[in-house]
């Protein structure tokens, strides 16, 4: 399947996309050359043969793809700011009017981070400066492309020692582009006491919370996310259907699922038959969910690809797409006033309320 053609031409909201999984291949090549970092190819086509894929792999093999290109980006100030800026430009071209992009500040740093990621030598780019650079890139992109962009800082399941700093950065930049905390990585690793403490502090300080859960892992991981970590949204969450009682409860409370159809196919999170995808059940039950790209670089995709899949295989209509995006806006981590402005933008574009101008 190729990148999608536009199937829904109205404004869209995207809540689940990883900054380090959404870098332009041209940008990777530029910084690889500039910094003398070897890459598995010297052209976009060659690079993409190693970085992206189109038939299902395990989540573990998918995660190994990052090793091919992250050394060209991590630890470089210009690169970090630029990938954030370019993401906003890409989303604007896709018709997204609001995006929440997530990343681990530690995985883009090379100083005051233990261990230093991607085999880098120690440098002078700290996790906090990474947050500042991403904020700059997002804010410059907002100004130039006239969409709204906010960020979510990720704790990593395999690195609980980073989590205390992640929540402190969320607190410090809470009113400056950062809207939430996330927990990502291998779901086989249960949330450690450090992750739990970080989420407790986030809740205490009014920081929004989402958790990757029930993607490759079982429904018990969603229980952990909701009841232990007090998640307000679930990243993926497909395996919630294995626990009907939990599913009914989350339907009742309008828990939001950040669904990524093409990703769920390529990581083997779901059965390869899209007609049996959990989203079919979510749609039938009018659950609260959004449609997102996750890692469009590695999946060689864009938002139209995911919209195309649910239209072709799950019979999504224009009205379904409108409902999904209104759900996304309502479940966004924007402050209430900005959330209402976003909803009004969608209502007006969708012809659901008369224009007030």
UniProtKB/Swiss-Prot annotation:
It is found in: Cell membrane; Cell junction; Cytoplasmic vesicle lumen; Cytoplasm. The record marks 236 as: Important for catalytic activity. One of its GO terms (biological process) is T cell activation. It is an enzyme of class 3 (hydrolase). GO terms for molecular function: 2'-deoxyadenosine deaminase activity; adenosine deaminase activity; zinc ion binding. Signal peptide: none annotated. CDD domains: ADA (cd01320). Its cofactor is Zn(2+). Zn(2+) binds at residues 16, 18, 212, 294. It is a peripheral membrane protein. Pfam families: A_deaminase (PF00962). Substrate binds at residues 18, 20, 185, 295. It comes from the Eukaryota. Binds 1 zinc ion per subunit. One of its GO terms (cellular component) is cytoplasmic vesicle lumen. NCBIfam families: aden_deam. PANTHER family: ADENOSINE DEAMINASE. Belongs to the metallo-dependent hydrolases superfamily. Adenosine and AMP deaminases family. Catalyzes the hydrolytic deamination of adenosine and 2-deoxyadenosine. Plays an important role in purine metabolism and in adenosine homeostasis. Modulates signaling by extracellular adenosine, and so contributes indirectly to cellular signaling events. May act as a positive regulator of T-cell coactivation. This is Adenosine deaminase.
